């Protein structure tokens, strides 16, 4: 089954490249990939949680074509819940896709699924034949990407379709960009890997109150 969500691509003249960025690796000319810092940080927290088990997630954002330049802006990540085991590895099931669609509407309106994450702590950030097969089945757009992660050795890499669309290849690099990104902040509070939202809110409130004896 092919899953589609609204807002698959945009061509907007008013779009501007992120200004505050950190380059990771080389520059990928075929597709400029920008991942927001809150997303990047959250994915590492998510990957390390639960005893370092294998995890999947969806990447959400927008795709742009501007003056011949193809740009992928990744502004959010959604945990993959209700995954299924296929051939000894985790995969999105029908329940997973339904959950992602609901979270997309709740937290990331106007965005679409632009790729997915496969985190296998301690196994590197390599592309496997099973990952490529899954990607080609469910992520058919030539701008949809796979982000492979190893949170133990802190290794990661993006994979994208090659020029003729016959398979995936490793991206030469990507950019981490910095933004206020309220959508991802809200998602992180409700899906914290560190502490529940209520506890985080209590700590934040306490920090804002004046200390006894303070002038």
Label the model's feature ranges:
Residues 1-113, 122-215:
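Conserved beta-strand-loop surface patch within small alpha/beta domains used
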């Amino acid at each position: 089954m092919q899953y589609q969500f609204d807002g698959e691509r945009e061509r907007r003249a008013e779009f501007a490249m992120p200004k505050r960025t950190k380059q990771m690796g080389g520059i990928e000319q075929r597709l400029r990939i920008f991942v927001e810092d809150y997303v990047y940080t959250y994915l590492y927290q998510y990957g390390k949680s639960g005893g370092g088990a294998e995890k999947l997630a969806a990447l959400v954002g927008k795709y742009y074509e501007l003056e011949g330049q193809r740009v992928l802006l990744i502004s959010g990540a959604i945990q993959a819940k209700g995954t299924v085991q296929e051939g000894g590895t985790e995969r999105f099931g029908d329940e997973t896709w339904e959950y992602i669609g609901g979270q997309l509407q709740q937290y990331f309106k106007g965005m679409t699924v632009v790729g997915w994450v496969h985190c296998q702590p301690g196994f590197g950030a390599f592309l496997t034949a099973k990952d490529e097969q899954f990607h080609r089945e469910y992520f058919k757009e030539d701008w949809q990407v796979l982000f492979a992660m190893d949170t133990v050795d802190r290794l990661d890499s993006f994979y994208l379709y090659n020029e003729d669309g016959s398979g995936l290849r490793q991206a030469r690099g990507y950019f981490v960009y910095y933004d206020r990104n309220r959508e991802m902040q809200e998602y992180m509070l409700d899906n914290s890997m560190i502490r529940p939202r209520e506890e985080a809110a209590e700590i934040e409130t306490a920090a804002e109150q004046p200390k006894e004896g303070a002038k």
